[in-house]
Amino acid sequence: MTNFDNLTPKEIVRELDKYIIGQYQAKKAVAIAIRNRIRRQKLPDIWQKEVLPKNILMIGPTGVGKTEIARRLAQLSGSPFLKVEATRFTEVGYVGKNVDSMVRDLVEISVNMVKKERMEQVKDKAEQMVEERILDALIPESRKPQNISFMGLFTASQQQQPSPEERRSLRQKREEIRQKLRNGELENEMIEIEIEKEISPFIGALGQGELEDLGIDLGSMLGSLMPKTRQKKRMTVSEARRTLLPIESEKLIDMDKATQEALERAQNRGIIFIDELDKIAVKSSGSGPDVSRQGVQRDLLPIVEGTTIMTKYGPVRTDYILFIGSGAFHMSRPSDLIPELQGRFPIRVELSSLTRKDFVRILVEPENAITKQYQALLSTEGIELIFTEDGIEEMAKIAYELNQRLENIGARRLYTVVEKVLEEISFEAPDVQEKKIIIDAKYVMGKLENIISDEDVSSYIL
């Protein structure tokens, strides 16, 4: 996180260039927005309250990198990130999801993110605790003596305590088993472990969904009042390790502090990406579905503007959450949004359609290029996959031409073409004798020629 905080806008753009081809203006806009957040944190408190994020509206066809830019930026900055579709929401009073739920979902993501980080910090200690529990299950007689209660003074007094020699022998045996456990010799041994299980109250009839919209988590409230039961389960040592590690890790985490950190992170570093904003940007005719679409815009306005939303973890202010709106705006224009909402997305960037050259670069340059992914996947079967320059050019050309003839779905068409070209290799990989496979222009055309020539077929398959 600290390393990212030291990145300049130019360096942020260079980081994004590793995964997304082109779209410099969009990368520049998000880099400035994130850098301004870092600048804001260095200001005196009085100025921090005044400086609000400048929300961004990305305009461009599908498959050109709008979502990927926002997602990669969130990963780089360690920010809680949520993508939602504007069309999923309905106006308050209608059946469906209210726009407030996006803030609650963001907080949930933030809590899970912080919890995961805290669990990673205590992993070593938790692994030691798991090891002790597994040893207790493997050698029950070596367990540490439990604290004797007042009543136990009368009932347990008759029980014979092990002699010093027996205790020494048990300790030695425990250490021998511990060594075998660490060497991985007992992974398939069956053991019986006790797991605490909370009794979940049945609350379906009480309308939990509606209560969550008010920031009330009835399940947790009632669940804390219910007794916990201990359930015995038989499983292998390796399964027990996977089961017990999160349980023991949670015991070491201060969840109150983790929750406070998560709320602060969601409020000050959260990013909400609202896709399909163009679908609700329709000039109202005063009746029909347009009324509901305008209602969703009006409901979005206070959240984007800055308000306080109640969540089950506590109140969350949306003033400093960065909102990135997105849409193709083929059938509508940004000016079709209600004026107040337009004003809340002051930075507008237009993403250009991808060219044939862009497709070639997408297949070669990104660190996660689909060609590199397939080379890595098939290398597990001992196959060396080689893409020649003319093979790459041919796939890019076919994808570009299909986008022109059929619907333009951007880079997604390219992925469909590559999948079709490599379909047979992926299927036959375990059985092929020739372990070096060259994907050139001739090979590509051999796999796609019949499909491309028949427009009806290509519209379904590619």
UniProtKB/Swiss-Prot annotation:
GO terms for molecular function: ATP binding; ATP hydrolysis activity; peptidase activity; proteasome-activating activity. It comes from the Bacteria. ATP binds at residues 21, 63-68, 275, 340, 412. One of its GO terms (cellular component) is HslUV protease complex. GO terms for biological process: protein unfolding; proteolysis involved in protein catabolic process. ATPase subunit of a proteasome-like degradation complex; this subunit has chaperone activity. The binding of ATP and its subsequent hydrolysis by HslU are essential for unfolding of protein substrates subsequently hydrolyzed by HslV. HslU recognizes the N-terminal part of its protein substrates and unfolds these before they are guided to HslV for hydrolysis. This is ATP-dependent protease ATPase subunit HslU. It comes from Pseudothermotoga lettingae (strain ATCC BAA-301 / DSM 14385 / NBRC 107922 / TMO).
